[in-house]
Regions:
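Acidic, PIN/NYN-like endoribonuclease modules and their adjacent C-terminal/linker elements
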Residues: 103-131
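Active-site neighborhoods of divalent-metal-dependent phosphate/nucleic-acid chemistry enzymes
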Residues: 67-112
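Short active-site oxyanion
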Residues: 28-31, 64-67, 111
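Anion (oxyanion) recognition and catalysis
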Residues: 25, 62, 107
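Short, well-structured N-terminal submotif of metal-dependent ribonuclease cores
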Residues: 1-33, 46-59, 131
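Short secondary-structure boundary segments
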Residues: 35-36, 73, 117-118
């Protein structure tokens, strides 16, 4: 499965559904994260919790066995197409920059995507249900 930034942040920020999101992360195999989403998650968590937040992210990644996948040219093109089809200001899904890379990795690996919210459910990507 591919993990979107929103799922990691739900766990790190201890949002109400954090236990269920953490359970979904642990249930998935393999667990992949786009390098673009790692940076996005780092920026958000460190802006809220400082460098300690970054360390919490690193620990979550390590303990969960999440593999970071580099963005290649095919994923970049898939992300461009995703933005054209589902991007903010173009479609109700309103995918942002990071969302487009999560979408691209899921599409390129033919894997479902774990996320929070309702943005990706308005696209054509397969979704991981949160219990």
């Amino acid at each position: 499965m591919v993990i979107d930034t929103s799922a990691l942040l739900a766990v790190l920020l201890q949002e109400p559904d954090a236990p269920r999101v953490a359970q979904a992360i642990e249930a998935g195999s393999p667990r992949l994260l786009s390098a673009a989403n790692l940076l996005e998650a780092s920026i958000v968590i460190e802006s809220r919790k400082g460098e300690a937040g970054g360390r919490e992210l690193d620990l979550l990644m390590y303990r969960s066995g999440i593999e970071v996948v580099a963005v290649d040219q095919d994923q970049a093109e898939t992300a461009r197409v995703a933005w054209r089809r589902f991007g903010k200001g173009r479609h109700p899904a309103a995918l942002n920059y990071g969302d487009c890379f999560a979408y691209a990795l899921a599409r390129s690996r033919r894997m479902p995507l774990l996320f929070r919210g309702n943005d990706f459910s308005q696209t054509d990507i397969d979704c991981v249900p949160v219990p």
